[in-house]
A protein has these predicted regions:
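Short coil/turn segments at alpha/beta junctions that flank glycine-rich nucleotide-binding fingerprints
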Residues: 3-7, 72, 111
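C-terminal peripheral helix-coil segments that are non-catalytic and often amphipathic
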Residues: 67, 71, 103-111, 129, ...
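All-alpha amphipathic helical-bundle segments outside canonical DNA-binding/catalytic cores
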Residues: 91-93, 110-127
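Helical hydrophobic small-molecule/effector-binding pocket
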Residues: 59-92, 127-138
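Residues in the helix-turn-helix
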Residues: 10, 24
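Alpha-helical structural segments
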Residues: 3, 13, 17, 27-67, ...
Length: 168
């Protein structure tokens, strides 16, 4: 699914890779779409909970997401397929993964530690900045094989840019 999307994914290839059979796959997930939804849900939960979220350190969280995107480019590809094939507009993921983060941003805003504005828009901006060098980038997709100095340079730029964007 990560290389061909939901439409291009073939059940025979999926069951061979998972070492299962069609009856088990359909019995558990109901359909190929159900499997795709379960995979997206699992991968989204993993990446968004990979590091601690601190609304007072959105720059640090963004750098953590940059590193997660390097370690797990498959999630970014799955999200791109989801956007292309099933949800061309609006919220991409399940809101339940965002609620606690948005509440934390709202509290930080009320305390004057994060700039005013719609918490969801700020959250989306930080996510987009963290994905600037991900496989979803239209300009450049970074890989773990690149020199660490390149990643350090990007991390520093990302940290500073997010800090400037969210500081009141």
């Amino acid at each position: 699914m990560r290389s061909n999307g939901i439409a291009g994914a073939r059940i025979d290839r999926i069951i061979a890779a998972a070492q299962t059979n069609k009856a088990q796959l359909y019995g558990y997930f109901g359909s190929k779409d159900g499997l795709f939804d379960a995979v997206i849900d699992d991968r989204t939960a993993r990446i968004l909970s990979a590091g601690p979220f601190d609304a007072d350190d959105l720059p640090g969280w963004a750098v953590g997401l940059y590193d997660e995107n390097l370690r797990h480019p498959d999630l970014v590809r799955l999200m791109a397929w989801l956007r292309l094939e099933r949800r061309p507009a609006g919220r991409l993921g399940d809101q339940r993964y965002d609620d606690a983060k948005l509440s934390a941003i709202t509290r930080a805003q009320a305390a004057g530690r994060v700039r005013a504005g719609d918490p969801f828009d700020l959250f989306v901006l930080v996510l987009a900045m963290a994905m600037a060098w991900s496989p979803a980038s239209g300009s450049y997709a970074a890989t773990p094989e690149e020199p660490e100095a390149d990643h350090d340079r990007r991390r520093a730029l990302l940290h500073d840019s997010v800090r400037r964007a969210v500081t009141p």
